């Protein structure tokens, strides 16, 4: 423990210092204790010329008037600018400058495009006139009545020199009358016959009356309706083969001119549906006999007369004897008509063919060696019509099966099963 010294009483304790005292006051007190001279700043007079250290308050006070001065100056400047803007400004005239190179190139390009458009338009219009001149100059007169050799060589007749054959004939139509009149009948040419058919042209040939007119035309014609065949009476099939070879060796004779039937439609009339009927044929082992009507109702077309295949051999053949038809009260009939009348009406029969010519139909049945056939007469549009039927069958299926037993030529005509009630109604 330190000893107490008398000097210690004179020394102040630093712990006894007041908290508010500054370091200068402490230093001053120490200096006074030591006896050092002190300067009293209050007694010193400072000149205004000396720079004083400004305080913060003084700085703020000095800055405020400076800011006010700057604001006043800026306001004055804005007012001056507004005054200057309000004054009308004089427009300065643009100095005339030479055209730039770019503008010159654009103008040249536009001129070139215009020239191209004009040139293309003139080129398109020019060929039309030149082509018309070429076509006019390239036209050649063709003389149809001239010689073929001259036309082949390119020789053209001199203009202005025309013969009587080349002169053009004026065609004048007759004047039209105000009142309806009958049309002029065209001039009939040689080898043709005019036939007037009633009804529409599409269904005119299906009418029995029109078929009869066509049959009459075919009968009156001088042309054969079937190819000529040669069949001697003796030697059977061997002589038939020899006749074919002879006809092949001999040249064909000239044929007479055909007769054409001109069909003109008239006013339509009520048509009656006809049943399909096979075409009648003439016997093969005969000379060319009378022409046969070859019309077929379901086809509604008239078959043209076929050409002669060869000349007939000069051999006389016996024509088949015509069978006498058993006359009945209704008209011409052949066969057992009573069996058809007495059979039940629910049964069926086979219709083989029909025609307006009784003799041809009966002769064809004889030629095909048909058995139990019946030819009976009926009327159709007021005209006689003959139907060829064969057999009596209990059902339609049985009648269809019986078709296979018929000759091949008969089967080719497509026979069909017909109810007996229709046959019995026709016989009454």
Curated annotation (Swiss-Prot):
Keywords: Cell cycle, Cell division, Cell inner membrane, Cell membrane, Coiled coil, Membrane, Transmembrane, Transmembrane helix. Residues 86-95 have a biased composition (Basic residues). Residues 288-335 have a biased composition (Low complexity). Residues 55-87 form a coiled coil. Residues 236-248 have a biased composition (Polar residues). GO terms for biological process: cytokinetic process. The chain crosses the membrane at residues 104-124. Residues 7-36, 50-64 have a biased composition (Basic and acidic residues). It comes from the Bacteria. GO terms for molecular function: peptidoglycan binding. PROSITE patterns: SPOR (PS51724). Pfam families: SPOR. Residues 342-419 form the SPOR domain. GO terms for cellular component: cell septum; plasma membrane. Residues 1-99, 149-191, 225-344 are annotated as: Disordered. It is found in: Cell inner membrane. Residues 65-82 have a biased composition (Acidic residues). It is a single-pass membrane protein. The SPOR domain binds septal peptidoglycans and is required to target DamX to the septal ring. Belongs to the DamX family. Non-essential cell division protein. This is Cell division protein DamX. It comes from Escherichia coli O157:H7. The lineage of its organism: Bacteria, Pseudomonadati, Pseudomonadota, Gammaproteobacteria, Enterobacterales. The gene is damX.
């Amino acid at each position: 423990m330190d000893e107490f010294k008398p000097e210690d009483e004179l020394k102040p304790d630093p712990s006894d210092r007041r908290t508010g005292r500054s370091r200068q006051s402490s230093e001053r007190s120490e200096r006074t204790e030591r006896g050092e001279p002190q300067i009293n700043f209050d007694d010193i007079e400072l000149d205004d010329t000396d720079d004083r250290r400004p305080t913060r308050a003084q700085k703020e006070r000095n800055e405020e008037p400076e800011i006010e001065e700057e604001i006043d100056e800026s306001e004055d400047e804005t007012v001056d600018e507004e005054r200057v803007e309000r004054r009308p400004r004089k427009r300065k005239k643009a100095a005339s400058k030479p055209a730039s190179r770019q503008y010159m190139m654009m103008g040249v390009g536009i001129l070139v495009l215009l020239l191209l458009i004009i040139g293309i338009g003139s080129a398109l219009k020019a060929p039309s006139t030149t082509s018309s001149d070429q076509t006019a100059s390239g036209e050649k007169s063709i003389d149809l009545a001239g010689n073929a050799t001259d036309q082949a060589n390119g020789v053209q007749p001199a203009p202005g020199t025309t013969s009587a054959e080349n002169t053009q004939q004026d065609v004048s139509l007759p004047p039209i009358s105000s009142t309806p009149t009958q049309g002029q009948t065209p001039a009939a040419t040689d080898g043709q016959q005019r036939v007037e058919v009633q009804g529409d042209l599409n269904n005119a040939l299906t009418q029995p009356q029109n078929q009869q007119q066509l049959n009459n035309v075919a009968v009156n014609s001088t042309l054969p309706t079937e190819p000529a065949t040669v069949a001697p009476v003796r030697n059977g099939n061997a002589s038939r083969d020899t006749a074919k070879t002879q006809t092949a060796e001999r040249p064909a004779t000239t044929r007479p001119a055909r007769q054409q039937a001109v069909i003109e439609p008239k006013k339509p009339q009520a048509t009656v549906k006809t049943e399909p009927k096979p075409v009648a044929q003439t016997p093969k082992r005969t000379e060319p006999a009378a022409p046969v009507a070859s019309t077929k109702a379901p086809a509604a077309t008239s078959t043209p007369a076929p050409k002669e295949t060869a000349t007939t051999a000069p051999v006389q053949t016996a024509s088949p004897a015509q069978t006498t038809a058993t006359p009945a009260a209704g008209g011409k009939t052949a066969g057992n008509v009573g069996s058809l009348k007495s059979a039940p009406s629910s049964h069926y029969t086979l219709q083989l063919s029909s025609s307006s010519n009784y003799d041809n139909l009966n002769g064809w049945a004889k030629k095909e060696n048909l058995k139990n056939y019946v030819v009976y007469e009926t009327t159709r549009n007021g005209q006689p019509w003959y139907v060829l039927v064969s057999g009596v069958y209990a059902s339609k299926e049985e009648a269809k099966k019986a078709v296979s037993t018929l000759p091949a030529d008969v089967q080719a005509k497509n026979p069909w099963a017909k109810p007996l009630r229709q046959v019995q109604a026709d016989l009454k």
